[in-house]
Design a protein with these regions (language model features):
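Segments forming oxygen-rich coordination pockets for charged ligands
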Residues: 1, 14-134, 141-144, 168, ...
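Short glycine/serine/threonine-rich phosphate/pyrophosphate-binding segments
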Residues: 115-118, 178-183, 204-207, 298
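Adenosine-phosphate binding glycine-rich loop
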Residues: 199-271
Length: 377
């Protein structure tokens, strides 16, 4: 009754205050990694920037900022450009920028014999696989059990609905050059994917390229088309051809440094990120490779969860490299602290373990503090 007797503006003011408080509590209930996953639904990349003094200390003293690409600092932008964590040091001060990207899609246009192993192997190496074909007998979940999506539709319409992003990897393996041209034509109207490859003989590929160039297709984009698709390994069977295709995709993702577009080259296991977001209350430590030199078993960005009861999820390389940090990780659980651990695989200890990697890693070990304040925006 008292509320109804108040001026209308007063009711609105109280309602707005309540909404603001609700939103603050909603963010507080979402841990850092939940916030990252949520933001990645609407942005192509994020940089988690940490700064701290000393190789070990309290998490409360660590500055943490989560920024979108355009808002990132110089070191954050460098991490996004390189596609993996970047570590800067000045005396005892550390600055670490860790990039995060949505899980990349592998879009397979065509559901024929080659598409089967490409979809399977693509899912196994961490892609979210989408298969498109205009024939129901070739585009159904039973045929592609490891695909996240199987779409039976006209190629042009399906491509339009998929809204191709710069983080996508696309294989054109249709049954004829007319469909190849339709796919290329539609893809050329939107954002350029990280990888675009097309199967076919040199003659078939040449016909399609010439046709589209005469229509006004961008010659520079056409020059980046991987066709004939795959690395030259002499593959004959569908499985061998699929291996050559995935090898080329991995090469573009990991090694194509001349391509200045932002790409995810981090060694992060996306399943680890999801687990961190989904189980905020269980005691654990988070282990992240922040710098890697030489032939270390895992690259920068590799992340592992260590539980108090001995369970682990993810890996930073196994063997002596992993054993060196497991004890440190368990000792930090519940402490509210962090520590940088240096792992040297060039010495006698590594040789005794049969490790011939010869690399060096800097690993950030953090207690997963459930009461830690959210990152600054």
């Amino acid at each position: 009754e008292a509320m109804r007797q108040q001026p209308r503006w007063r009711n609105c003011e109280m309602r707005n205050r309540w909404l603001m408080q609700y939103k603050r509590e909603e963010v507080r209930d979402m841990n850092l990694y939940g916030e990252i996953l949520k933001k990645l639904e609407g942005t192509p990349c994020l940089a988690l920037e940490r700064s701290f003094v000393g190789e070990e200390g309290n998490l409360a003293d660590m500055r943490c900022e989560l920024k979108e690409g355009a808002e990132a600092s110089e070191i954050g932008k460098e991490a996004l450009t390189q596609g993996q964590p970047v570590c800067g040091r000045a005396g005892s001060s550390w600055n670490v920028a860790e990039p995060f990207f949505p899980k990349e899609r592998l879009i397979i246009l065509g559901g024929g014999h080659v598409a089967l192993p490409v979809a399977e192997f693509g899912a196994r190496v961490g892609f979210l696989v989408t298969v498109v074909d205009d024939r129901l007998s070739f585009a159904n979940p039973g045929r592609f059990p490891m695909a996240e999506k199987v779409i039976c539709d006209d190629f042009g319409h399906a491509i339009k609905e998929l809204k191709i992003q710069e983080s996508d990897y696309i294989c054109i393996v249709t049954r004829g050059h007319r469909h190849d041209a339709d796919c290329l034509r539609m893809i050329g109207k939107g954002k350029e994917p990280a990888y675009l490859g097309m199967i076919g003989s040199r003659r078939r590929v040449g016909i399609v390229k010439q046709e589209l160039l005469e229509e006004g297709y961008d010659p520079e984009r056409m020059s980046r088309l991987k066709s004939p698709i795959g690395l030259k390994i002499g593959g004959v069977t569908p499985e061998e051809i699929a291996i050559s295709i995935l090898a080329e995709i991995i090469q573009v993702k990991r090694m194509d440094r001349e391509d200045k577009r932002v790409k995810n080259r981090s060694d992060l296991d996306f399943d680890v990120l999801k687990r961190l977001a989904e189980e905020p209350d269980e005691s654990k430590a988070v282990v992240t490779v922040i710098e890697s030199k030489g032939s270390s078993p895992r690259g920068a960005g590799a992340k592992m969860i260590v539980y108090r009861d001995g369970r682990i999820l993810g890996s930073i390389g196994g063997g002596c490299s992993e054993a060196a940090v497991l004890g440190e990780a368990r000792s930090l659980i519940g402490s509210g602290r962090y520590k940088v651990v240096h792992v040297d695989l060039t010495g006698e200890a590594a040789e005794d373990e049969g490790m011939v990697c010869g690399g060096i890693m800097d690993v950030l070990v953090e207690d997963f503090a459930t009461d830690r304040e959210p990152c600054d925006r």
